[in-house]
Amino acid sequence: MPVITRSRILITLTIAITSFVLSCGDDDDDGGAATQPAGGATGAGDISGQAVDVLGIWGADELPNLEAMVKPWEDETGASMDFTGQRGVGALITSRVEGGNPPDVAIPAEVGLFQDLASEGRLTPLSDCGLEDEIRGNYPEAFVNLGTVDGTLYGFFMKADTKGTIWYNPKTFEENGWEPLTADSTWEDLVALTDEIRDSDLAPWSIGIGSEADSGWPGSDWIQQIILNMDDGEELYDGLLDGSIPYTDPRVKEAWERFGEIALTEGNVSQGSSAGINATDFRVATYPPFETPPAAAMNYLGAFAALFIAEQFPDLVPGEDFDFFPFPGGGATGGSNIVFAFNSDPATCSLLRHLASADAQRIWVELGGFTSVHTGVSLDAYPNETARGAAQQLLEAPSFRFDLDDALGGETQQAIFAGATEYIANPNQLDSILSNIQATR
């Protein structure tokens, strides 16, 4: 199989997401029959007392769900997972690898990082753990291809998210006569809705792009959603990924300025200022629309926002007290976390087998905030209509693209994150910001 290029990442995942949702019919619980038991201990021997060192993207909010997913494996095997999670985990993985101390398992979002590590011969083929047939038999072919580098299968995708979701309180909208947007709505419709809400003396938006070492990525998510839904947005998005279109293109500048139109217009944001936007953690920014009384009307963030909202406000009912409508234009970006290993030790392979199973992934799906790409986990497993709707959006979006900065990875990704933060603070420096991003290509 040929090497997976950055442009093929985009094309392959677009096909993969569609294939995955088409496979999710009614759950007859037979889809996972080809997998090993969720405990994953088959063939591992005695691994009790051993700890598997895992680096991943999930922080404190998502960690309890990951731990719930892993607990059956720990109970069955007597082994444990030693997990370190942070949003900037790609840099930590790189540092550990370059320092000669790689983790046993890594679960980042950056497909570009995975591809680079595999091409350098740093990763362990899944066949060394006896997992290749299992992955090929239970995951859509396009996802299998995306985890394959130079003909060798190194990784599998465990969790997917759409990022075409704007979160709101349906009751607040109904009380004020505001209409949620649809996939057919335009950017102008979103601006008009923003103006209408602002005129009611409620801040239309809550926006926070703080995220520790990776601050700025929520702003990048806004911008790539805008790019995809512009006129000829798919062509522009694809060109930015494969490098045929520079970041200094006037259409890219327009997309950033559209983000600024929302974030930097006085009265639009509950955080009150550019400094407030940069200082507010992205998780905390999901709260204001659902406070009593609400401090904002809307928050843009991927489908995983449902987890933060539900944890902060456990009495809210999905679909009644919080829901989402599609980003104007209907096109959706999204991402998926890839799982790969640096060794084939028995405990490492046993944990991989568990994480790859339908039974294990169904645990997190049922808890919420998780979309599985395993063909044995159906839409019926999702806990409510809001969660099912987020999974369904991956199929219904008129266009879908893999998260742009995750696909680019490395220095360019960090320049985009830093650029988003700088733009919020100093919008008059946009030309310089875009030139700096382009200089990393």
Predicted segment positions?
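Hinge/lid segment of periplasmic solute-binding proteins
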Residues: 41-46, 109-164, 321
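Conserved N-terminal structural module of periplasmic/extracytoplasmic solute-binding proteins
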Residues: 22-115, 120, 132-133, 363, ...
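Conserved C-terminal helix/tail region of periplasmic/extracytoplasmic solute-binding proteins
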Residues: 174, 392-441
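A structural signal for short loop-to-beta-strand junctions that line the ligand-binding cleft
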Residues: 95-96, 103-104, 135-172, 323-324, ...
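Extracytoplasmic/periplasmic substrate-recognition and gating elements
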Residues: 71, 176, 298-371
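Glycine-centered hinge/linker elements that transmit conformational signals in sensory
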Residues: 194, 238-277
